[in-house]
Amino acid sequence: MEKNAGTDDALALSEATARDYLVLLKPRVMSLVVFTGLVGLVVAPGHMNPVLAAISILCVAVGAGASGALNMWYDADIDAVMKRTRNRPIPAGIIAPNQVLAFGLTLSAFSVVTLGLMVNWLSAALLAFTIFFYAVVYTMWLKRSTPQNIVIGGAAGAFPPMIGWAAATGEITWDSVVLFMIIFLWTPPHFWALSLFSANDYEAARIPMMPNVKGELSTRRQALFYSIIMAPVGVLPWVLGFAGPVYGAISTLLGLAFVYYAWRMWVAGSQPEMLAAARKLFRFSLLYLSGLFAVLLVEALVMKALIAFGGF
C-alpha cells in the first residue's frame, strides 16, 4: 500500500508541465522587473548593441525568475496556508521542493555568468546581489522576522533599473540611483495596501506584516508618509535632466494622485471604507509605477531616434 502511494506521488510530480515551471518564475512580478530593467537600459546615455541589450534583458528576466523559484522553495510552508498561494506548484504537490531548489539555483548561475561574460561584470554583480538579497535576506530572514520586511526587502525589486543602466554604461550613476529610489519608496505603500485587505491571510501564515503587528492605523499612516516622500522623488528624473518636460508633468500628476489615494486610505472611517481605499491605492500604485517608467521609456526612445536620424 505504501509502495503504491509512493508511486502515485512520483507520478504526480513527473506530470509537471512547462506551465508549472513558468509559475515558479512568478511571471507577473518578472514582467515588471524586466520592464523597469529595460527602462534603465534605454534611458542610460549612449547606444548599446541590440544583441547585447537583448542578452541583458534576458538575463534580468531569468535572474528575476530564479529569485521567484527560490522564494517559492523556501516559502512552501507559508504558501500552503495562504489562499492566494496554496495552488502554487510545491504546496499543490506538482513539483518536488528539491527540484524547485535546483531549478532556481541553475537559473541564478546561468543569468549571472551569462551577463558577466557577454555584457559586463558590474551588471552581473548587481544581478547576483539582487538574487541573493531577495532569496536570502528578504525571504529567509526579513519576511518572517520584522514588519519592516518589505521596506528593507523592497531593495531587491528596486535594483533592475540599475542593472539595466550598468549593462548599458558599465557604471553606477546618481541617475540610476534615482530610478532605484523611486521603486524603493514605492514598495511600502504598495505592499501595505495589499496587506491591509489580505491581513487574515498573512496572519494565518504568521507573517509579521505591518497591520498584524502595529495595527491598521499605523500602517495607513506610514503608507501616507512614504507616499509623500516618493512623489517628489518621482519627479527627480526631470529635475536632473535625464527626462523631459512631458515626464515632468505626468510624474507630478501621478505623484499627486498617489498621495491622494494614500490620504483617502488614511482618513477612511469605517472598515469597509478603509478596505475599499486600500484596494484603490493598491491598483493605482501599479498604474503609477508602470506609467512613470513607460513615459521615461518613450521619451528616451524618441530622443535617441531624433539623435540617430539627425533631427536633434
Swiss-Prot record:
It is a multi-pass membrane protein. The keyword Cell inner membrane applies. It catalyses: heme b + (2E,6E)-farnesyl diphosphate + H2O = Fe(II)-heme o + diphosphate. InterPro entries: Protohaem_IX_farnesylTrfase, UbiA_prenyltransferase, UbiA_prenylTrfase_CS, UbiA_sf. HAMAP family: CyoE_CtaB. Converts heme B (protoheme IX) to heme O by substitution of the vinyl group on carbon 2 of heme B porphyrin ring with a hydroxyethyl farnesyl side group. This is Protoheme IX farnesyltransferase. It comes from Brucella anthropi (strain ATCC 49188 / DSM 6882 / CCUG 24695 / JCM 21032 / LMG 3331 / NBRC 15819 / NCTC 12168 / Alc 37). The gene is ctaB.
